[in-house]
Amino acid sequence: MDIKELLNKTDRFAANAGCKITEVDEHHAIAEMTVTSAHLNGGHVCQGGALFTLADLAIAALMNQHGELTFGISNNIMFVSSAKEGDLLKAEATFVADHHKIPSVEVNVTNKDNKLVCHVTGMGYRKSVKLPTE
């Protein structure tokens, strides 16, 4: 099972939030989510936690693709524009540095018009254990 299938099956939090990995290769990972009424905050725009969940799933796919368990240890999110109900969002994660122990990534979350919604940077820690397969 590849990382896309594995995380789409086992990351229940992301799945329950409507997030799904659509693409993973050596250099990037993409996750997508359509904003629903369940994602909206009191201002009637997509809640920041939903945006972070989408970005975090793309980060997880990129950092864990070689089967070595990697957890996030630091993340920063900058909100640039609002996402509204019905928007299809795409989070594309790329490596800044694919260090063997502490990789760092950046993620751009965009809407269907390729407008930047938020920018995320993150660092992970690769443990010396295999990624669980269930």
Task: Please tell me what each predicted stretch does.
Residues 1-134:
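Terminal targeting signals and extreme-terminal segments of soluble enzymes
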